[in-house]
Amino acid sequence: MLQTTSTLEEPKYDSLQSLPLALQIGIQYGGGGEGRVIAELHKFLPAAGFRVLGAVAEPDDIAASTRGEFLAFAPTSASKLDRFRGARRKLGRILEVDRPAIVASHFSLYSLPIYDKISSSRLVTHFHGPWGAESAQDGASVLAASARMLVEKSLYRRSARVIVLSQAFAKLATERYGVKPDRIRIVPGSADIDRFAVGVTQRYARERLGLPLDRPILLSVRRLVRRMGLLELITALKQIAARVPEILLCIAGRGLLRQELEQRALDLGLSQNVQFLGFVDDDDLPYLYRAADINVVPTQALEGFGLVAAESLAAGVPAMVTQVGGLPEVVAGLSRNLMFASPRAEDLAAGLTDVLLGRLELPSNLECAAYARENFSSPLMANRIAAVYREIL
């Protein structure tokens, strides 16, 4: 039976050093969905009863910014083999010297170098998404995608617990990877509520970022890859602009699809309606959400949670999402009007046009912010994850 965690009362400890240690292993600290979870656990797990150390592939200077509590495997310029060796050396030393009570893997490849050193009884996998399937969607060869899936399966099946972000990913872990349901725990993701609840007006946010004050703005914060649905969103914008000519779509993020997206906008005559922002600094991201009228999450495939939807709600801005993966689980409790009928361009256009013309009502800024604080705070996520960790101590 699949279980959603409840928050248990945390044990009391006299000092941080007396807490059981949870070693976190991942790709990145602070960037992307997985990296943000790692950073939030580093910040909030101690209050939930676990000391945290970790090792990641990037950034290079992570040791300096975390007081040595996180290490980089190797310089980001290093070869994959050198990163692999660095992971084995540094993780192996932490296992030997610090003896963590929990080994928490956020990415199967970088846990592979220490498979022979990890006891299955203390291994927890944080399942952020199907690496092999995502790489296939992004253009990897069948052989490469299959090899990645084998690495994933070997880790997930060894794990004492597998933490997933949604009911959709719980089903995927069981059906695709053969994880036993009684080992799966559902812990929704989180947003740093206080960081995104900037408490400024939309006008102030737009002035700060140099965005127009007199146009309705749609925002989409995405990696620029095909499954994120940006081609469909730009196609939908053609229909929206026919009814709301002053509409502006701001796309934030980087990726290999940038040139194709720009060409699609040009071909559809939307050069004045689409603005590509590229990478947006973490300090500016809360203001970017606040500047928008609607945050659009048009995912076409493989979305476990949808962190950008939770972040947007925390900023007080409604997020309209496709009914893909775990996205409906993020917004359904707030309003079903936040879900598109389908991921197709025509349904994206219909839903957004109805809102912009006042035919469909979305939750208010205050309702969005209150819902995010109640359901997606980082301390709440940390307490739920700590409860899972304690199950296997």
Each model region followed by its residue ranges:
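A short helix/loop element that forms part of the nucleotide-sugar donor recognition site in Leloir-type
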Residues: 9, 197-211, 366
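Short His-centered aromatic/hydrophobic patch
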Residues: 105-110, 127-128
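Membrane-proximal helix-turn-helix segments that form the acceptor-binding/catalytic region
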Residues: 143-164
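Carbohydrate-associated surface elements
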Residues: 168, 190
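Conserved donor-binding/catalytic core segment of Leloir-type glycosyltransferases
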Residues: 212-228, 234-237
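Short hydrophobic beta-strand element within catalytic cores of glycosyltransferases
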Residues: 318-321
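Conserved acidic donor-binding segment of nucleotide-sugar-dependent glycosyltransferases
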Residues: 333-346, 354-360
